[in-house]
Amino acid sequence: MAIISSNIGDNDLPLRKKELRLVDSKIIPEEKRNNNLNLARPLTLKEFIGQEQLKSSLRIAIDASIFRKEPLEHILLYGQPGLGKTTLAFLIAHELNTKCKIATAPAIERPRDIVGLLLGLKEGEVLFIDEIHRLNRLTEELLYSAMEDFRLDLTMGANKGTRCRTINLPRFTLIGATTKLASISAPLRDRFGISQKIEFYNYDELKQILLNFSRLINLNLDDEASYDLAKISRGTPRIALRLLRRVRDYAQVVMKTNTISVNLIKKALNSYQIDDKGLDSLDRHYLSFINQNNNIPIGLDSIAAGLGDDSSMLEFVVEPYLIKIGFLTRTPRGRLLTALGKKYIDSKNDDF
């Protein structure tokens, strides 16, 4: 069931979708087992950098829950991967002085899986379900009464032998996380008392995260270098820390130093085919392919076929950042480069 306890303690060729992209916000195996990354996690909401409005709302809700001695209302966190949804779930549990159990929706395959999770909870505990939009219908429906009335309504047997059984549950808080809010059914979405979007981080917030982590791993990283790295991290702490670790590799192995300068960052990222905009080879091939269409809109499926990639991956992994930085626009007829995007890709013809 993939339940985890909450003890916080190249060349320029198109990348295939199963290859690691340093600028992909999805977590990779190395990051799951990296002890330094675990040590870098904040222990309280106050230590959590960024998301000030979200933290303020959570602080009020948590304090009100403690004051009334009631369970915190169920919380839905939505936003792009790598912004801290799992970390926030741990912090909420910590602030409530309780435990947090984690499950991922794809691992909850059968109704009995969610039943086992719910029956294993104690009074006041937090259950965090990542990718909650991927719950199957039967499992989701079991959550309705559990979230609303803290009970399970189970149907057992078949045909004439069918009988219903109600099991009371301890009062708990469900925290759901999703990157696809629109994919969550209305009945499930409406049962969350608190729904909050996790925003991208600004440069100063990412810079502080990088400086804190550099001290933890004994790197000399100055303000200017940390700010330069923050600017190409796509507003995402996970990407920022991953890039810093790769820059550290280059610094220690190639340059034999623990001091990170702006020039060293440029050389290191250039070796990984990442430019000063934070774009990699897949981004550039995507932009170049559209640019060849001479300002005529082109459909996503045609782009995917031309690049040999999955259209869903391009839509949800590649395009959002290109739109965010003003290089790409979506129209009813297809994708188009903006003037900025065309200027950028034309200038990259000889760079990589």
Swiss-Prot record:
GO terms for biological process: DNA recombination; DNA repair. It is found in: Cytoplasm. One of its GO terms (molecular function) is ATP binding. It is an enzyme of class 3 (hydrolase). Mg(2+) binds at residue 86. Residues 276-352 are annotated as: Head domain (RuvB-H). Residues 13-201 are annotated as: Large ATPase domain (RuvB-L). It catalyses: ATP + H2O = ADP + phosphate + H(+). Its EC number is 3.6.4.-. SUPFAM superfamilies: P-loop containing nucleoside triphosphate hydrolases, Winged helix' DNA-binding domain. One of its GO terms (cellular component) is Holliday junction resolvase complex. Its main location: cytoplasm. DNA binds at residues 330, 335. Residues 202-273 are annotated as: Small ATPAse domain (RuvB-S). ATP binds at residues 41, 82, 85-87, 148-150, 191, 201, 238. InterPro entries: AAA+_ATPase (IPR003593), AAA_lid_4 (IPR041445), DNA_helicase_Holl-junc_RuvB (IPR004605), P-loop_NTPase (IPR027417), RuvB-like_N (IPR008824), RuvB_C (IPR008823), WH-like_DNA-bd_sf (IPR036388), WH_DNA-bd_sf (IPR036390). Belongs to the RuvB family. The RuvA-RuvB-RuvC complex processes Holliday junction (HJ) DNA during genetic recombination and DNA repair, while the RuvA-RuvB complex plays an important role in the rescue of blocked DNA replication forks via replication fork reversal (RFR). RuvA specifically binds to HJ cruciform DNA, conferring on it an open structure. The RuvB hexamer acts as an ATP-dependent pump, pulling dsDNA into and through the RuvAB complex. RuvB forms 2 homohexamers on either side of HJ DNA bound by 1 or 2 RuvA tetramers; 4 subunits per hexamer contact DNA at a time. Has 3 domains, the large (RuvB-L) and small ATPase (RuvB-S) domains and the C-terminal head (RuvB-H) domain. The head domain binds DNA, while the ATPase domains jointly bind ATP, ADP or are empty depending on the state of the subunit in the translocation cycle. During a single DNA translocation step the structure of each domain remains the same, but their relative positions change. NCBIfam families: PRK00080.1 (NF000868), ruvB (TIGR00635). Homohexamer. Forms an RuvA(8)-RuvB(12)-Holliday junction (HJ) complex. HJ DNA is sandwiched between 2 RuvA tetramers; dsDNA enters through RuvA and exits via RuvB. An RuvB hexamer assembles on each DNA strand where it exits the tetramer. Each RuvB hexamer is contacted by two RuvA subunits (via domain III) on 2 adjacent RuvB subunits; this complex drives branch migration. In the full resolvosome a probable DNA-RuvA(4)-RuvB(12)-RuvC(2) complex forms which resolves the HJ. This is Holliday junction branch migration complex subunit RuvB. It comes from Prochlorococcus marinus (strain MIT 9301).
